[in-house]
């Protein structure tokens, strides 16, 4: 597998921020600004039809967690994804057709906008995933569209018609063109695809491969794509063909077998960003045991990940995974097991643990979340240190 260099300004910005912490030759103890991860936020789906979606923030410094329902109003019914831009967390509320704006420091609701009012009833219903690029936000809707949202005016400036039931999205491209890649899940009906949007011209084309039937998340390195696909279900609801696929020029190769969620972190060699480490877990419907894997896009190697040291807070029903973009530490969220039934309880608050990149539980990092933790993100801040 070719070892492609990153060629997007977004990737290089991340590389420069990280390497500035590593390659400091200052010997006079002059205070320097460095970027650190200050915490993690978790979007909790809440209980179906109870309107109790919430946000949990885990503060690294105090190792304490706060879960908020935004003054009682909550994040609606089934918040599904979130993206941090500046000091605002933009949360997509799938059932409510909303994008909620939350202040990342006070965890209070700033504002909200209706995606159906912005885009139309049929185009804007059920927003699913959101990302940011060049100070704009991009979100998918089950109406089959991607909306481009101006965070200052809260208006949709462009909308792009993509495939059926779009989910995750990611930016990639070449030295001359920036593309937005979109997972079209087809709602699990088996005719999934990837849409490629040229951000300069607005043109859209479709990438299809028979192996990729139900794409959910996507990671891009240039035009190399790594797609988390949920495959399909047989008549007994066994999940078949789920995994992580490498897609290039229309081909698709499974690099991780059996995976239901994933997150990534940039790999650095000699201070240069060279690829991703993609960490996955597999816990399909009906499972009793989760498995974890790591795939290195630079070497093309897959390895297993074994969690350890967490016997007091064992992850038994994983629901989300996030990888700290600076340290590579891993946060895994879990549903709580009902002691009477022995099964995951979808009505109780969940919890999360932090692990080193090698899978060792980090003492003091167990914390409670809201009901059904679903999406994990991280907050980065600049701080002044002396060397």
Where do the language-model regions lie?
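Bacterial Sec-dependent N-terminal signal peptides
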Residues: 1-41
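A short beta-strand motif characteristic of beta-propeller blades
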Residues: 22, 63-74, 108-121, 155-160, ...
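Short coil/turn segments that connect the beta-strands within blades of beta-propeller domains
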Residues: 36-40, 86-88, 134-136, 174-178, ...
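Conserved beta-strand positions in repeat-built beta-propeller and related beta-rich domains
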Residues: 42-50, 91-95, 138-143, 180-189, ...
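Blade-loop segments of beta-propeller domains
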Residues: 67-131
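Repeated scaffold domains used in trafficking and secretory/extracellular systems
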Residues: 76-84, 121-132, 164-173, 211-222, ...
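Acidic, serine/threonine- and glycine-rich low-complexity intrinsically disordered segments
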Residues: 155, 164-287
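Intrinsically disordered, low-complexity segments enriched in Gly and acidic/Ser/Thr residues
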Residues: 256-348, 354
């Amino acid at each position: 597998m070719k070892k492609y260099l990153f060629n997007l300004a977004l990737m290089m910005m991340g590389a420069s921020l990280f390497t500035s912490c590593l390659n400091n030759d200052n010997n006079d103890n002059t205070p320097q600004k460095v970027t650190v991860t200050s915490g993690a936020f978790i979007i909790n789906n809440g209980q179906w039809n109870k309107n109790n979606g919430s946000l949990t923030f885990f503060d690294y410094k105090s190792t304490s967690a706060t879960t908020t329902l935004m003054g009682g109003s909550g994040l609606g019914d089934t918040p599904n994804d979130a993206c941090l831009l500046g000091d605002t967390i933009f949360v997509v509320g799938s059932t409510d057709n909303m994008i909620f704006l939350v202040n990342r420091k006070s965890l209070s609701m700033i504002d909200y906008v209706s995606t159906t009012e912005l885009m139309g009833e049929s185009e804007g219903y059920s927003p699913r995933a959101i990302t940011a690029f060049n100070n704009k936000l991009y979100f998918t809707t089950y109406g089959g569209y991607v909306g481009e949202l101006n965070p200052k005016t809260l208006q949709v400036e462009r909308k792009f018609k993509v495939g059926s039931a779009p989910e995750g999205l990611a930016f990639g491209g070449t030295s001359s063109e920036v593309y937005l890649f979109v997972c079209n899940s087809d709602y699990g009906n088996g005719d999934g695809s990837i849409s490629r949007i040229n951000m300069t011209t607005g043109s859209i084309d479709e990438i299809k491969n028979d192996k990729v039937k139900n794409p959910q998340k996507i990671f891009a390195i240039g035009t190399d794509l790594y797609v988390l696909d949920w495959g399909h279900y047989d008549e007994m609801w066994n999940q078949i063909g789920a995994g992580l696929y490498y897609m290039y020029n229309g081909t698709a190769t499974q690099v991780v077998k059996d995976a239901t969620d994933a997150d990534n972190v940039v790999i650095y060699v000699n201070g240069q960003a060279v690829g991703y480490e993609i960490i996955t877990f597999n816990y399909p419907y009906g499972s009793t045991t989760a498995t974890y894997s790591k795939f290195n896009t630079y070497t093309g190697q897959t390895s297993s990940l074994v969690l350890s040291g967490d016997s007091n807070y064992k992850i038994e029903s994983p629901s989300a995974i996030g990888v700290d973009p600076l340290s590579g530490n891993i946060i895994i969220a879990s549903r709580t097991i009902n002691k009477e039934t022995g099964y995951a309880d979808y009505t109780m608050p969940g919890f999360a643990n932090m692990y080193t990149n090698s899978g060792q539980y980090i003492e003091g990092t167990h914390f409670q979340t809201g009901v059904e933790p679903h999406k994990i993100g991280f907050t980065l801040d600049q701080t002044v240190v002396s060397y």
